[in-house]
Regions:
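Short, solvent-exposed secondary-structure boundary motifs
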Residues: 1, 60-116, 166-174
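Gly/Pro-rich hinge or "lid" segments in bacterial periplasmic/extracellular proteins
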Residues: 96-119, 127-128, 133-203, 207
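Short, surface-exposed, charged/polar-biased interaction segments
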Residues: 52, 56-68, 143, 153-155, ...
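Short, polar/charged alpha-helical segment
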Residues: 1, 6, 191-192
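Conserved positions in beta-strands of structured domains
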Residues: 4-7, 123, 179-181
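Aromatic- and charge-enriched surface segment that lines or borders ligand/interaction sites
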Residues: 4-86, 92, 131
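Extracytoplasmic/periplasmic ligand-capture domains
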Residues: 20-52, 108-110, 177-216
Length: 216
């Protein structure tokens, strides 16, 4: 619902999305800031940051150009910095310039130079134009965008809360038909109608409450 139109360029394997004007709201339904293409970029960078342990990062690395190389480099760098040794004996070391050497148990070594996020195939062309460049022609990409790794997130909030982002209603922002008003982990969360949403007149439910089933 955040895009008004989109185009596919088969020659460059690039999807271009033209975004509508929409706002982020906080847990009280108050406007925080406009939604921009950069929010999609920031969110994807968050997903591709190993420190945040995204469980579905594979939905990005498999399809978005450069995403796998970027993610793997930072996995290897983290392993080097924390002294990880894999079960098969693989070790990781990093030099002062950030070049990581991955050495297998048979002493075979591969090196990986630092990877900049600019090499990942997601770009904010301007505030309302977003592009994704893929590894290959994948007709199902539009459906893939409904999955969590491709959702936008308010960049300044990601930066402020890091791994605590969206762990409470106070650390979240919403831009859909409903906003997160209350959240108690493993108990319940409450969504309320977002009056700022472009299609608010078509939403006839004011409050949705989810309650966890504590039974094992």
């Amino acid at each position: 619902g955040l895009a008004t139109s989109w185009d596919w360029d088969a020659d460059t394997l690039t999807w271009t999305f033209h975004l509508r004007e929409e706002n982020w709201v906080d847990n009280n339904g108050e406007v925080v800031a406009p939604v921009t293409a950069q929010d999609f970029v920031d969110a994807l960078k968050y997903v591709l940051t190993p420190d945040y342990a995204s469980s579905n990062v594979g939905l990005v690395t498999a399809y978005v150009a450069g995403a796998e190389d970027y993610y793997n480099y930072y996995v290897y760098l983290n392993n080097a910095n924390t002294g990880v040794v894999d079960d098969d004996g693989t070790t990781y070391t990093a030099d002062a310039s950030g070049v990581v050497t991955v050495t297998s148990a048979d002493a075979t070594a591969e090196t990986y130079s630092p990877v900049d996020f600019d090499t990942v195939g997601v770009k904010a062309v301007d505030d309302h134009t977003l592009t994704y460049t893929l590894n290959f022609d994948f007709p199902g990409f539009l459906s893939l965008l409904s999955y969590a790794p491709y959702e936008p997130a308010y960049g300044p909030l990601l930066e402020e809360f890091a791994d605590q982002f969206c762990t409470s209603a106070e650390t979240a922002c919403s831009c859909g038909a409903f906003y997160l008003a209350e959240y108690t982990p493993l108990e319940n969360w409450v969504m309320k109608k977002n009056p700022e949403n472009y299609d608010a007149d078509s939403v006839y439910i004011d409050t949705v409450r989810y309650i966890y089933n504590q039974e094992e």
